[in-house]
């Protein structure tokens, strides 16, 4: 927390609540309907981006992965996959802010109930929770999907406060978003698969740590660079 807090004081009051997403859709804000159209467009674009990153295949050491989002019980421990979807979720949250990030990730979650937009082309309520042999059962990936919504909202709120305008704040915001995803996803996976804590961490956390480090580094570059390009870097006009 202390890493980003000192910089927040530099953010002008008029800048708070503005995210980099406000510069992405060229629709005038003058009239109320135009503002609503801009927000709606950003929410839909964010949901589409999350869906696309859910199905980006990552190739490492000659093997292809489509993780995370599709965190399978049979996930190999090695080689460690570099993931795409969690970065997409956190990117959308940081770009759109609290409400739009929350709604965008939520829209993606709802779309996946009927359309094959979850990782690996999965879809349906059973991915989150369903009936198995007459009993309710949790889907192994359901916790991660729900965690995406919370993470997008949290990262979005931090972006509204200006954390993403400098390297330290962007990295910390993304780190907190990742932690939230794990806090929801790992216990859910443990219950769904009958894992103990050690196995849950081995299957649901450790294989993604290298990818997480890469995401944090990329986020620490992308967001401050984007703010610099629009002339609002580090909270300055």
Q: Where are each of the predicted segments found?
A:
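Short helix-perturbing small/polar motifs within transmembrane alpha-helices
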Residues: 15-32, 50-52, 124-181, 224
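Alpha-helical transmembrane segments in multi-pass membrane proteins
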Residues: 42-53, 89, 93, 104-112, ...
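Interfacial aromatic-anchored transmembrane helix boundaries in multi-pass membrane proteins
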Residues: 55-81, 107-151
């Amino acid at each position: 927390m202390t890493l980003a807090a000192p910089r927040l004081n530099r953010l002008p009051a008029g800048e708070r609540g503005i995210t980099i997403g406000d510069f992405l859709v060229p629709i005038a804000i003058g009239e109320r309907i135009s503002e609503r159209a801009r927000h709606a467009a950003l929410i839909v674009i964010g949901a589409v981006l999350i869906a696309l990153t859910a199905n980006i295949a990552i190739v490492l050491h000659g093997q292809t992965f489509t993780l995370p989002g599709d965190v399978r019980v049979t996930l190999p421990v090695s080689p460690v996959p570099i993931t795409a979807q969690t970065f997409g979720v956190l990117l959308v949250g940081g770009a759109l802010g609290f409400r739009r990030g929350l709604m965008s990730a939520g829209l993606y979650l709802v779309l996946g109930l009927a359309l094959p937009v979850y990782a690996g082309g999965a879809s349906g309520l059973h991915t989150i929770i369903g009936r198995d042999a007459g009993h309710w059962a949790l889907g192994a990936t359901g916790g991660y999907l729900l965690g995406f919504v919370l993470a997008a909202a949290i990262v979005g709120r931090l972006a509204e406060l200006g954390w993403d305008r400098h390297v330290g704040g962007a990295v910390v915001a993304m780190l907190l978003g990742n932690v939230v995803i794990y806090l929801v996803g790992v216990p859910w996976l443990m219950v769904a698969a009958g894992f103990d804590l050690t196995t849950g961490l081995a299957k649901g956390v450790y294989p993604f740590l290298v990818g997480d480090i890469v995401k944090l580094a990329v986020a620490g570059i992308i967001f401050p660079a984007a703010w610099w390009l629009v002339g609002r870097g580090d909270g300055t006009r």
